[in-house]
Each structure stands twice: as C-alpha cells, then as structure tokens.
Amino acid sequence: MFLKEEEKLIQRQIQELQSTLFSIQTRIEDLDRTQYMEFGTCKIEVYPKRYCRYLKEKIDQDEKIDFLLTKLSESMEEDISVLGNMDSGSVVEYKNNEYVYTSVFILTQEDKHDFILDEGLYCTYTYSGQYDRTNQLFYKMKDWIQEHNYKIEGPFLEFLLIDIHETKKVEEYITSIHVKVKPR
C-alpha cells in the first residue's frame, strides 16, 4: 500500500508542476506580445466584456498594490498567480481634485465575479519605465479624450504588464492605462 500512496503523491506533484509550467508558458507568451505594443500614444481600442474580482482598500503606495493583489488571489478559489499577471491591476478614481488608487482587481471567469468591465471603447496609453509619471498621464489622457470628442465613462484602470516580478531593470517596466470612453 505504501507504493500506491507514493504514486498518488507523485501524480499530485506532477499535476502541480504541469499547472506551474502552463502558467509560465502563458506568461512568456504574454511577455512576447508586449514587443508589438505601441508605446507613448493615446489610442482608442475595443474590448469585450471582462469579469473581475476586486478588493477595495485605501492604497497609498505601489508596494501595497502587490500585497492587495496577493491577498485577493488567496481569497479566490481559482489557482492563479497574480504577481506578474497581465490580467490584474488597480482602479484609479478622481476624488477631491486628485487621482487616487481605490482598489485592485483580477480578471476572472464569468460565474465568479464582483463587477464587470463593460465591453466597448477604451482609450489606452502604454508606456515603459518608471511609474513616477503615471499621475500626469491621467491628465494627458483626459485632455486627449476631450480633444478627440470622447467622454470618459468610468475610472482609469492601470495594468502593470511588466514590473519588478519580471525584471530588475526599471526601464523595462511596462504599464498600460485604460479608461472607458464614448463619443460625445
């Protein structure tokens, strides 16, 4: 009977390793796609309906975003790794004359969600390098949206596509900001 127990243990370990391998392969494909992204310009893109889980807490520093994403992923039944996951990010709202981070989210399956990112038009801006200019980019995007006869329809969404979990070189970080818009 010992050998049967050992076999079950090994089968479980193999499944875990296969899951980890699949996750890594998917992440490599995601990272490869970033080389085809357009940087430093606002553009309008169409996105499908996206289902999300979220954790709403005061976020006063970048390090707390990782902590909250990890906390959120642990509360989910799905086996996911959010650190370095292009399907996770933070919500940024305009409150009291400033942009503030109000929650973190993870895209998830349809039947397990807290809110929905509606399908439709999104103004996007993707850039590389440090995060210290992100706040001014919200204003830049807002101006671009108005100049191109669109109206903002929700909060800004910040996706950290490549960050400290993939590279130690700050110049290799990639951030994508999205905000839902509609024509005026």
Where does each model-flagged region fall?
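A solvent-exposed interaction/effector surface
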Residues: 1-184
